[in-house]
Curated annotation (Swiss-Prot):
GO terms for biological process: rRNA processing. It comes from Fusobacterium nucleatum subsp. nucleatum (strain ATCC 25586 / DSM 15643 / BCRC 10681 / CIP 101130 / JCM 8532 / KCTC 2640 / LMG 13131 / VPI 4355). It is an enzyme of class 3 (hydrolase). The keyword rRNA-binding applies. This is Ribonuclease M5. GO terms for molecular function: metal ion binding; ribonuclease M5 activity; rRNA binding. CDD domains: TOPRIM_RNase_M5_like.
Length: 183
């Protein structure tokens, strides 16, 4: 029996809908990629946002991140779910549609709200202390840690911003960091 998700899951395309519905029992809404800026998706999503809540699940690429930013401007209290680049890539194609049902379920379980708090725990010094910036393997570490925390991959500065924006505690960060270093 598939896990039931109460929020509406927002994806980019029709193949993403199929992949998500294969993984969970949920209402899924397609924004048609960058066409979200031109069509009536925002108006339609407002009702779902107010009544059920939204989970934004876009592709783990630049275009997906741009679409996520656009949606988050309109729906600041939506949850964000991330598929890793590794689990979202098949034969050179990157997208939610390539992720396994298990990876989609994991991403949805790790979905996070963006917090509007003024306390930033993570700074450049901490990022350097944990080799998340400035080292040859920093990008790989951020990719693994982003997948473990459910916040996706980003460059160093954006990764630090996500850690703060999603309210990740230092304890949660350290546990995830230890876990990826045991693999």
């Amino acid at each position: 029996m598939k896990k039931k998700i109460k929020e509406v899951i927002v994806v980019e395309g029709k193949d993403d809908i199929s992949a998500v519905k294969n993984a969970v029992d949920a209402e899924v809404f397609q924004v048609n990629g960058h066409a979200v800026r031109k069509n009536k998706s925002i108006e339609i999503l407002k009702l779902a946002y107010e009544n059920k809540g939204l989970i934004i699940l876009t592709d783990p690429d630049y275009a997906g991140e741009e679409i996520r930013k656009y949606l988050c401007k309109h729906f600041p209290n939506a949850k964000n779910a991330y598929i890793s680049r590794v689990s979202g890539t098949k034969d050179g194609d990157i997208g939610v549609e390539n992720a396994s049902p298990e990876d989609i379920i994991t991403a949805l379980e790790k979905a996070r709200f963006s917090l509007d708090n003024s306390v930033n725990i993570f700074n450049l010094d901490l990022m350097m202390d944990y080799n998340l910036i400035g080292k040859d393997n920093s990008a790989d570490l951020r990719s693994l840690l982003g997948a473990e925390l459910g916040i996706g991959y980003s460059n160093g500065k954006q990764f630090m911003a996500k850690l703060n924006r999603y309210g990740i505690s230092l304890e949660e960060f350290k546990k995830a960091y230890e876990k990826i270093n045991m693999k």
